[in-house]
Amino acid sequence: MTVPVGARKVFTDGACSGNPGPGGWAWALSTTEYAAGHEAASTNQRMEIRAALEAVRANDGPLLVVSDSTYVVNCFRDAWHTGWLERGWLTSAKKPVANRDLWEPLVALVIERGNVAFQWVKGHSGHEMNDFVDALAVAACFPGAP
């Protein structure tokens, strides 16, 4: 996957307390430019996709979405989305794509913009920005908690 010229790096992460359970998502361009959100009942996979979706929605221009989710990164790096579209949102096993309600708008935005790429980063490995968005996503699982 080619990184668009002039791309800004946006780091994303999702978290869930229990799986399913309360979920949180976050994206950050820096430790001062970020957003996070909450879903009362979700899964870790849904929150990972939601983090990427919200990052792409919120940030114009060329983007490199950096995620520790192979689920999110592989969708675009390995072009899973192309097969899903060709098969009418069915997997290669002819089963409905899980989390289509989140994948569909994310895939549409990425295709429409044409200037978004994805990169995997190992989670919980001491990477400053990945650790930062992880902490934001975990905190977002329980908004208002001390």
Regions found by a protein language model. Name each.
Residues 23-29:
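Short beta-strand scaffold segments in enzyme catalytic cores
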Residues 142-146:
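Acidic two-metal-ion nuclease catalytic site recognized across multiple nuclease folds
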Residues 10-22, 34, 52-132, 136, ...:
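RNase H catalytic domain
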Residues 5-9:
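Extreme N-terminal starter segment of soluble prokaryotic enzymes
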Residues 31-48:
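A short, polar/acidic, helix/strand-boundary loop motif
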Residues 1-2:
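Short glycine- and acidic-rich boundary segments immediately preceding or forming the N-terminal edge
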